[in-house]
């Protein structure tokens, strides 16, 4: 019996990516593995269908859990709110509930200075990170309220420490950190835990 038996977890950016030695190199997949070890039903999202299919196959074979993958590209210039709603609707249709939301996915142009950053590069980080997190939280809220669930949002040390060449990434992550604090205040009375993780890498 695991801590998350029959619970449903959505993990953005949860596809499998292999390192040169064949081991898993995706943070999202590592998170999915941790929840699968505890018996959770897993929903992984991302842009690359091959990586998502590989994640599903490995999680189901290695841990005996059920896994659903949903392709979801939340880049700028698209109807990202509808894309996110598609993921949430698919998760509820498959598993009947949402107990944990992990907002892990984020794309950005690394190593570009403030002076040289383009609007498109800035939009890439803001849409894939800040807006996506906002839309997922909104879409999952009624289900998390019902399940007394949890949200885990990924921010970053890049914003906390002003990492060189990380302006858009840092801005998006600091937005996520602030939004998480507000949501924790607003959603606490509903029994929803909202936490933010700030990796240093």
Predicted regions located by residue number:
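Canonical Rossmann dinucleotide-binding motif of NAD(H)/NADP(H)-dependent dehydrogenases/reductases
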Residues: 2-41
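Active-site loop immediately N-terminal to the catalytic Tyr-X3-Lys motif
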Residues: 21, 115, 148, 161-167, ...
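Alpha-helical segment proximal to the catalytic Tyr-Lys
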Residues: 142, 185-189
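Rossmann-fold cofactor-recognition segment
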Residues: 63-79
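Active-site helix of classical SDR
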Residues: 137, 172, 180
